[in-house]
Amino acid sequence: MNSSQGLPETQEKRAKWFKSHGGVNAVVEAGLLSNTVSLGLTEVLVLGLIRQGITKFLMILGHGSTEFGETLRVYESAGLVKGFQFRNEVEMAHAATALRWVYDEPCAVITSIGPGALQAMAASIVSSSNGIGVYHIYGDETTHGEGYNMQQVPKREQGIFGQITATMGSSYTLHTPQAFRDALRRGATRVFHPSKAGPFFLNLPINTQPAKVTLRLD
């Protein structure tokens, strides 16, 4: 068991444990997560998004979002989230905007690194211009600077994709895994703002996605 009361060691068992106890919010409200735990960044983000009421993920996965996709697979198998596969990022982003706009269901768009993210970003203009809050979560180049990661922006500068998303609207790059709290706070402020909502772009470098984070889940 992990150091928190009753929290299993593996991701699969943790997801089932959350489900058997009524879900993530029920576990937190019952005070069962009072101690520190060490989890991968993508799992922490999924749990944080669930806490914000986001359980629907519209996705086109690739090498830039493999780790995030695997975490979603595990939590979907446990019945805690629902994933929807698409073939076109523009269509996917429009569907997410409509889901929030028409049915008031918060959701997240997930893409890989590069061209797909650019297409989703182009379609985000609809949610931005109409004040519709949607998470846009994109895979991003590693923070190691080891050379081009396939399909990243081909320019010899640091954090190019983060510059693009920052130009488009509210944006955050999780260069440091421990910054997840700030990222989720800023995301919630943008996505759930009562009068100035819009898309929130969260860039996830390939190497930080599996990185361990020590935290209290309550």
Residue ranges of model-derived segments:
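N-terminal alpha/beta PP-like core and its mobile active-site loop of ThDP/TPP-dependent enzymes
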Residues: N2-D218
